[in-house]
Amino acid sequence: MDTLEKQKKPKLSVTRFLCYNGIIAAVYLTLVYVFQFMSFNAVQFRIAECMTILPALFPFSTLGLTVGCFLSNTMSVWGWIDAVSGTICTLIAALLTSVIKKPYLAALPPVLINSFVLPLVWFLFAGETAYWINVLWVFIGQAVVLYALGIPLYYFAKKHLVPIVYNTRL
């Protein structure tokens, strides 16, 4: 167990909580906007999803991720269906990730929840019939983003952002 896991993280002030979550939501939204061409549909590599590993280090980031996802999904061709269902997936995944401290396991909730729930929503609301194929495509996209980008982001944040956010030295 490393120093980060041994020490109790101090509570954030309301101002810092709101500012950090605003930044997280804005970065998520910006990444989806810039990479729209690969952020929607069954075959997607939503770069912003790499941030869904952050609750493992910063449980408070659940709010920013949820808001960022909601705002991003309003750009989807699926409209409010995606805004609501995608946001619920992100919220549940972030809450689960916040209790998992090992990065390779912390990346699993967003991968698994999005992989199984989003194709189900497409099946129920849009008549998509290839449920298991869509599960596979979403799984591949999520896994690539979370493990290729999310894990390095986790280690970068652990080294460089944890001391700033929690005002501590490791």
PLM features: residue spans?
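Membrane-embedded alpha-helical hairpins and interfacial helices in multi-pass inner-membrane proteins
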Residues: 37-42, 50, 71, 77-170
